[in-house]
């Protein structure tokens, strides 16, 4: 229907929002030359895709990616898809919903679509099915490959992970045999940036703070958000004083990075 934008509509919406901010933020007292984009989990994956989109380069000063390296060579559950493959999957879902064309599909209610999506396989299947598409328009190359080859300049980047998220290993593996796929991807990325002489500062964190609770949860996916945004008091877990100290420091790091491009702020001597 629109060859210039055949897929990745969510990413295009994000680009449109970023463009609006860039053009209008000065009217609200902001600086269009100091825009930081950030995201966690799937949002982090979106940030990676936005960094790779050439039309965004003039607008993005810095980027924050928290546990979001879904587009990485170690995460096979989120495969990269061609436009042809994506269109085939879309046609299969049309048939599952009992429609023959786009016009009929647009007449379906949100409630019906959600019901059929759940029957189709819900989140586990959709995570592997409805991801970004290499459409030759918004996504034209593999981000990791481009960074490794020095084909893309990455702005100052703050990125990190929690040690107990997305761990995979052989059946029956103990903790020492598990592999944290996001950690591998982040180390691969930061090593590539250093190897290619990327002139911008990059900061890698590992969130490894003990998390209290009867369920012994470990350092699970998303747990660091309470700390970055200083919302520990809104959680039922029995956090102690040092947790709040860590939270304040993490929030300061994040704010410093957004303001200056350095987690230590402008007064850092090294």
Protein language model regions, located:
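Core-facing hydrophobic residues within beta-strands of well-ordered domains
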Residues: 32, 59-60, 202
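Alpha/beta-hydrolase fold nucleophile elbow
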Residues: 21, 28-41
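A structural signal for well-ordered alpha-helical segments within the folded catalytic domains
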Residues: 12-19, 45, 84-88, 183-187, ...
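Substrate-access "cap/lid" subdomains that shape
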Residues: 23, 52, 57, 62, ...
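Glycine-rich nucleophile elbow surrounding the catalytic serine of serine-hydrolase chemistry
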Residues: 39-49
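Active-site rim elements
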Residues: 3-8, 73-81, 143-144, 171-180, ...
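Alpha/beta-hydrolase active-site loop
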Residues: 3-27, 82-94
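Mobile gating loops/cap/lid regions near enzyme active sites that modulate substrate access
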Residues: 164, 187, 191-270
């Amino acid at each position: 229907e629109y060859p210039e934008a055949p897929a990745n509509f969510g990413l295009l919406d994000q680009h449109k929002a970023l463009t609006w901010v860039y053009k209008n933020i000065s009217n609200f007292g902001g600086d269009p030359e100091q825009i930081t984009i950030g995201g966690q989990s799937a949002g982090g994956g979106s940030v990676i895709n936005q960094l790779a989109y050439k039309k965004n380069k003039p607008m993005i000063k810095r980027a924050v990616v928290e546990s979001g390296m879904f587009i990485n060579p170690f995460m096979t559950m989120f495969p990269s898809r061609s436009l042809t493959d994506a269109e085939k999957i879309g046609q299969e879902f049309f048939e599952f919903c009992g429609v023959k064309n786009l016009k009929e599909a647009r007449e379906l209610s949100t409630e019906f679509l959600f019901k059929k999506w759940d029957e189709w396989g819900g989140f586990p299947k959709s995570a592997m099915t409805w991801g970004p598409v290499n459409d030759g328009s918004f996504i034209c190359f593999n981000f990791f490959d481009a960074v490794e080859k020095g084909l893309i300049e990455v702005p100052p980047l703050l990125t990190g992970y929690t040690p107990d998220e997305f761990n995979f290993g052989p059946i029956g593996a103990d903790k020492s045999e598990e592999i944290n796929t996001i950690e591998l991807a982040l180390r691969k990325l930061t090593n590539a940036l250093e190897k290619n002489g990327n002139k911008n500062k990059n900061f890698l964190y590992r969130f490894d703070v003990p998390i209290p609770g009867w369920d012994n949860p470990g350092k699970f996916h998303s747990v660091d958000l309470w700390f970055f945004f200083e919302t520990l008091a809104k959680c039922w877990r029995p956090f102690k004083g040092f947790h709040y100290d860590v939270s304040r420091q993490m929030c300061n790091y994040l704010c410093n990075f957004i303001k200056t491009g350095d987690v230590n702020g402008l007064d850092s001597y090294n």
